[in-house]
Amino acid sequence: MSETAKKVIVGMSGGVDSSVSAWLLQQQGYQVEGLFMKNWEEDDGEEYCTAAADLADAQAVCDKLGIELHTVNFAAEYWDNVFELFLAEYKAGRTPNPDILCNKEIKFKAFLEFAAEDLGADYIATGHYVRRADVDGKSRLLRGLDSNKDQSYFLYTLSHEQIAKSLFPVGELEKPQVRKIAEDLGLVTAKKKDSTGICFIGERKFREFLGRYLPAQPGKIITVDGDEIGEHQGLMYHTLGQRKGLGIGGTKEGTEEPWYVVDKDVENNILIVAQGHEHPRLMSIGLIAQQLHWVDREPFTGTMRCTVKTRYRQTDIPCTVKALDDDRIEVIFDEPVAAVTPGQSAVFYNGEVCLGGGIIEQRLPLPV
């Protein structure tokens, strides 16, 4: 079978990126079908309506392109492998990234297996802004061409084997080009806005949503000097570097500079704050990461120079990485970095290549 006669199942989300991905693959001669994944069905309110609208859009695009759309329900897998872990991390006072977990457990595991075993696919494809390159018989994950939209940060857990079975057609394009293709084709998704926030929360208020699953425990807000200046409604609602939603103004003797969360004392349920976004307590010289995933799946030993992102929209930080043991590394930044947050992911790069990453276990504070 020639490469292009191979069967590709495109994860159709009802958005513009997956819509254009399906068309691009058709143009390349692949045998294309779509799959709409339902990953959440805990409530049938607003999210149900959004999912129904997304499915209708995905169906309209598939009809327009003349391809079959399959549907599958991964809600049980999502609950067990993504959502419960998400809640456990929040409960422990950390700030997880469910998109990374969803890609790891659902889109590139459950979907990949379902497409291959049930639908006879040679490849899956998604609308992610990343690229793939095959070097020395191994697939590598590269940043998307559009640096504003690059999503490699969210896909660092993928192995070279998973990448070898995945296609990323829009990774070679910039977002405005993708929208233009969709407009020229008259696709209903052409002007649809990009989804933001956590998929299972949608447009709902985060506090309200989280409060349904985890009991909030109010506690003290204290300054780095130990003064009590307010009450928080629950540590899980706050993340390092946050300034909005603290409900505190300046102190009588202090400046009017805004307050930022600089630490959480989970054991005593205390939120620690300081004034100024570059307060020393907010800065870190490095971090310890665990639960490592290297794209090439080779164990990392010794040290290396590379760059790291400790959150999605961040400029690359030059750093030195040192192996501590099989599943832990120490990362030392060239310059101190603000708001390094336990539970989030540290993702490593060598130029355009995403090497892999891990979960931030602890940050290394500035020496006092």
Curated annotation (Swiss-Prot):
It is found in: Cytoplasm. GO terms for molecular function: ATP binding; tRNA binding; tRNA-uridine 2-sulfurtransferase activity. Residues 97-99 are annotated as: Interaction with target base in tRNA. It catalyses: S-sulfanyl-L-cysteinyl-[protein] + uridine(34) in tRNA + AH2 + ATP = 2-thiouridine(34) in tRNA + L-cysteinyl-[protein] + A + AMP + diphosphate + H(+). One of its GO terms (cellular component) is cytoplasm. Its main location: cytoplasm. ATP binds at G11, M12, S13, G14, G15, V16, D17, S18, M37, G127. InterPro entries: MnmA-like (IPR004506), MnmA-like_C (IPR046885), MnmA-like_central (IPR046884), MnmA-like_central_sf (IPR023382), Rossmann-like_a/b/a_fold (IPR014729). The record marks H128, Q344 as: Interaction with tRNA. Residues 149-151, 311-312 are annotated as: Interaction with tRNA. PANTHER family: MITOCHONDRIAL TRNA-SPECIFIC 2-THIOURIDYLASE 1, TRNA 5-METHYLAMINOMETHYL-2-THIOURIDYLATE -METHYLTRANSFERASE. Interacts with TusE. This is tRNA-specific 2-thiouridylase MnmA. It comes from Shigella dysenteriae serotype 1 (strain Sd197). The gene is mnmA.
